[in-house]
Regions:
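Conserved core segment of the aminotransferase class I/II
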Residues: 105-119, 297, 361-442, 446-458, ...
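Conserved PLP-binding active-site segment of the aspartate aminotransferase-like
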Residues: 393-394, 469-479, 495-531, 550-555, ...
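Conserved core of the PLP fold type I
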Residues: 178-334, 346-366, 372, 528-529, ...
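N-terminal small-domain helix-loop-helix segment of the aminotransferase-like
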Residues: 105-225, 276, 280, 285-289, ...
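Helix C-cap/helix->beta junction micro-motif
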Residues: 334-335, 455, 494, 537
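Hydrophobic residues in well-ordered beta-strands that form the structural core
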Residues: 246, 268, 341, 419, ...
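Amphipathic alpha-helical coiled-coil/zipper oligomerization segments
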Residues: 1-103
Length: 624
C-alpha cells in the first residue's frame, strides 16, 4: 500500500513539475519579449534624438532637418510597441504587471543574478528568490560579530530571533525528562503529527489563547515550521497565479513561502504612516483598505482566495483588538475568503498595558470553515532553530490536504516528544520562562527606544514581538527606495545589519526594522554604529541643503507669501500659512545639530530676517 501511494505521489509530483516548467518557460519568454521591446523603443528614440540634433545644427528656424518625417518615426515606434505588446499578451499567464501583485521575479529579482546551466528554469527562478532574500545575510554570515573572536564583525539586528533566553531554554531542553527514545518515535508517524503531541498542542493553545471552548487534537497539524505551513496552505487553498490578500508592511518571508512551490501571489493592501480622521494610529489596517486592494486585484483579473493576518503584527508590533478581528473576518466571509491568522508572537507581549487577543478566543467565528490559525515555538520559546509549527483549523478538507505535506515537511519523532514535554510544563512556562522572558524583552526594548529618543528618531512604540519599526526618512536625500538601500548599505558597511522597509513591501521609503531581543552589550555597540551612520548621513545632507539654499537665494527672489517652511526630507513642503509647529521644530532640530548654528543664529536675527515665519511660529507656540 505504501509503495503504491509513493508511486501515485511521484506521478502527481511529476505532472506538477512538468506543468510548472512549461509555465516558467512561457513566463521567461514573456520577460524576454518585454526586454526586447524596451531595447527597440530605446533604439527608435535614440535615432529620433539624433535626427533632432542634426536638425538643430542644420536649421535655426524649424529645428528639424529637412526631409525628416517625425510623424513616421513616432508611428514606427508605436507599431513596434503594439506588436511586442500583442505578442506578450499571447503569452499571458494570469499575471498583471502591477506593483500590487508580488511575483517570483518582482521585488525579489537581483540584477546581478547569473543563471546556472546546471539548473532548470524553475531551479534558476528559485535561486533568484533565495539569493535576493539573503542579500546582506551572506555578508553577515561571513563576518559575524563575536565578543572575543571577532569584535569588529557585523552585529545582526535584522533577523527576528530572541537571543535573550538561551540559558533558560538550554537548561530546560537538556533535562533527562525531555529525552526519550522508544520504537514509535523512530517509526513513520501519522503525517499530521503524533497524536500525543497534537493533544498537548490543543491543550496548550486552549489555555494560552483563552479559547472559547476546548480545542481538539483532530484539528491540529504539525509541520517543520510555520513557513512550511504557509507553503502547504498556499498549495491547498490556491491554484497557480491565484493570490492571498495581505496588508503591508509585513514579514517578507511569507512571499517566498507561498510563491516558491505554489506559485501563489500576494495582493497588497498598502498601509501608510499618516494618521487621518478615520485612523487612530499609523499603519492602521481598516476594512476599507482591504476592500480597495481586493477590488483593484479583481479588476486586473487576479483571483484572490484568502486573507493573511499577522497578530501580533510583524514588523509593526500592533495587536489587533477583538472588534478589529471581527471586522476583518466578517469582510473575508462576505467575499468568501479563507483567513490565515499567524499568531507566532502570541506569548511575546512583554508589557502589561498591552493585551493579546487570539482568533481562537472569539465565541463565534464568522466563517469557521475558512479560518486557520498558525503558531510555532521559534519566537515565543526563543528557539528559531527548532522547526515546529502548528496549524489549527476546523476544516477537515484542509486538514487532509495539508497533512499530505507531512511526508515532506514532518518533524522527527524525538523532537515531537521533546516539544510535547515543553508545552506540558505549564508551571515552568508561567513562573520561570515567561516571567523572565518578558522582563528581558522589556529591558532590551527600553534600552533601544531610549537610544532612539536621544537621537530624535521617530518610531512606533509597541509592546509585542522583538522589533521596532523606525522612521529614518529624514536621513534620505530623496524619498526613494534607492536611497533607502543606500542607507541600508551604509549600515552594513558600518558592521550593523538592519532590515529595510522595502523588504517588508512598505509603501513609504525610509522605514527600517530593528531587532532588540539581544544582549545589552551587543545592542549598545549596534546602536553606536547606527548613530555614527546617521550623524554622517545627516551632516552630508545638511551640507547639501546649505549649498542648494545658497544657490537658490542667489538665483531668485521668492515672494514672502510663497516662502517654503523647511521640514523633514520625507514631508512635502508647505506654505508659511499652513505650516505646523512640528515642521518648524523639525527645522530647528536639524539646524541645531550643526556645531556652530547657535552661535550664528539668534532669536532676534531670525525675527528680523524672516518676519513672516517668525510670526507664524510665535502664534503657534502661543496656542500650545
Amino acid at each position: 500500500m505504501e509503495e503504491r501511494f509513493l508511486q501515485m505521489e511521484e506521478r502527481r509530483l511529476q505532472r506538477d513539475l512538468e506543468a510548472e516548467e512549461r509555465r516558467i518557460q512561457l513566463e521567461q519568454r514573456r520577460f524576454e519579449l518585454e526586454r526586447d521591446h524596451d531595447f527597440r523603443m530605446f533604439n527608435v528614440f535614440a535615432q529620433m534624438l539624433s535626427i533632432l540634433r542634426q536638425g538643430n545644427q542644420g536649421s535655426s528656424v524649424t529645428g528639424v532637418a529637412p526631409n525628416v518625417d517625425l510623424n513616421q518615426a513616432f508611428s514606427n515606434a508605436t507599431e513596434i510597441g503594439e506588436r511586442m505588446s500583442e505578442e506578450a499578451k499571447a503569452l499571458h499567464l494570469g499575471q498583471t504587471r502591477s506593483d500590487r501583485i508580488a511575483s517570483v521575479h518582482g521585488s525579489c529579482y537581483r540584477a546581478d543574478f547569473q543563471s546556472s546551466p546546471y539548473l532548470s528554469v524553475r531551479g534558476n527562478s528559485a535561486s533568484i528568490v533565495w539569493t535576493s532574500s539573503e542579500e546582506g545575510y551572506e555578508v553577515y554570515h561571513a563576518d559575524k560579530y563575536d565578543e572575543d573572536k571577532n569584535p569588529s564583525g557585523i552585529i545582526n539586528l535584522g533577523t527576528s530571533e530572541n537571543k535573550l533566553c538561551f540559558d533558560l531554554m538550554s537548561k530546560k531542553l537538556t533535562q533527562s525528562s525531555m529525552n526519550l527514545i522508544e520504537p514509535s518515535l523512530l517509526q513513520y508517524p501519522d503525517w499530521k503529527g503524533h497524536l500525543f503531541v497534537r493533544e498537548e498542542v490543543a491543550r496548550f493553545l486552549t489555555y494560552y489563547s483563552k479559547a472559547a471552548a476546548p480545542l481538539k487534537a483532530e484539528n491540529v497539524i504539525l509541520l517543520n515550521g510555520c513557513g512550511s505551513l504557509f507553503s502547504a496552505l498556499a498549495m491547498v487553498l490556491c491554484d497557480p497565479d491565484e493570490a492571498f490578500l495581505i496588508a503591508t508592511p509585513f514579514y517578507g518571508g511569507i512571499s517566498r513561502n507561498v510563491s516558491l512551490c505554489g506559485n501563489v501571489k500576494l495582493v497588497y493592501a498598502y498601509l501608510d504612516s499618516q494618521v487621518t480622521g478615520s485612523c487612530t494610529r499609523p499603519f492602521q489596517l481598516t476594512v476599507d483598505k482591504l476592500k480597495k486592494a481586493l477590488q483593484d486585484a479583481q479588476s486586473e483579473g487576479v483571483k484572490v482566495r484568502g486573507l493573511i493576518l499577522l497578530n501580533p503584527q510583524n514588523p509593526l508590533g500592533d495587536i489587533y483588538s477583538l472588534s478589529e478581528l471581527q471586522d476583518y473576518l466578517e469582510f473575508a466571509k462576505r467575499h468568501e475568503l479563507h483567513v490565515i491568522v499567524d499568531e507566532i508572537y502570541m506569548l511575546s507581549v512583554f508589557d502589561d498595558s498591552a493585551t493579546f487577543h487570539s482568533v481562537l478566543e472569539m465565541d463565534r467565528l464568522p466563517d469557521p470553515q475558512r479560518t486557520h490559525v498558525i503558531w510555532g515555538v521559534s519566537k515565543d520559546f526563543a528557539a528559531s532553530g527548532i522547526r515546529f509549527g502548528t496549524l489549527y483549523t476546523l476544516n477537515q478538507d484542509v486538514i487532509k490536504g495539508v497533512a499530505s505535506f507531512g511526508y515532506l515537511h514532518g518533524i522527527c519523532g524525538p523532537m515531537q516528544y521533546k516539544i510535547a514535554q515543553l508545552l506540558r510544563d505549564r508551571d515552568w512556562i508561567n513562573q520561570v520562562y515567561l516571567r523572565a522572558n518578558h522582563e528581558r524583552l522589556k529591558a532590551a526594548h527600553t534600552f533601544v527606544t531610549d537610544e532612539l529618543k536621544t537621537l530624535g528618531v521617530p518610531f512606533l512604540n509597541r509592546s509585542a514581538g522583538f522589533f521596532i519599526w523606525i522612521d529614518f526618512r529624514k536621513y534620505l536625500r530623496k524619498g526613494t527606495f534607492e536611497e533607502e538601500m543606500i542607507l541600508w548599505r551604509r549600515f552594513l558597511e558600518k558592521k550593523v545589519l538592519l532590515s529595510p522597509g522595502n523588504s517588508f513591501e512598505c509603501n513609504e521609503p525610509g522605514w527600517f526594522r530593528i531587532i532588540f531581543a539581544d544582549k545589552i552589550h551587543r545592542l549598545r555597540l549596534g546602536m553606536q554604529r547606527i548613530c555614527e551612520v546617521l550623524e554622517e548621513q545627516e551632516h552630508e545632507i545638511l551640507n547639501e541643503d546649505k549649498d542648494q539654499l545658497c544657490q537658490s537665494e542667489s538665483e531668485a527672489t521668492v515672494d514672502s507669501t510663497d516662502e517654503v517652511i523647511f521640514v523633514s526630507h520625507h514631508q512635502e513642503p508647505t506654505s508659511s500659512g499652513s505650516s505646523t509647529l512640528g515642521d518648524l521644530i523639525g527645522l530647528l532640530q536639524q539646524q541645531m545639530r550643526s556645531s556652530d548654528w547657535l552661535q550664528k543664529n539668534t532669536v532676534g536675527q531670525f525675527a528680523q530676517e524672516k518676519p513672516e515665519v517668525y510670526d507664524v511660529f510665535s502664534k503657534l507656540v502661543g496656542k500650545q
